[in-house]
Amino acid sequence: MEISTTQISIILLIALIPAFFSLKLGKELYK
């Protein structure tokens, strides 16, 4: 099975977007 760069970038986006939002929410909560 061949992994293309587009698949890698999609996986990274899917992984990073929730982490980014949880960081933003955490900063808002701990003000």
Swiss-Prot record:
GO terms for cellular component: chloroplast thylakoid membrane; photosystem I. Pfam families: PsaM (PF07465). The chain crosses the membrane at residues 7-26. One of its GO terms (biological process) is photosynthesis. SUPFAM superfamilies: Subunit XII of photosystem I reaction centre, PsaM. Belongs to the PsaM family. This is Photosystem I reaction center subunit XII. It comes from Euglena myxocylindracea.
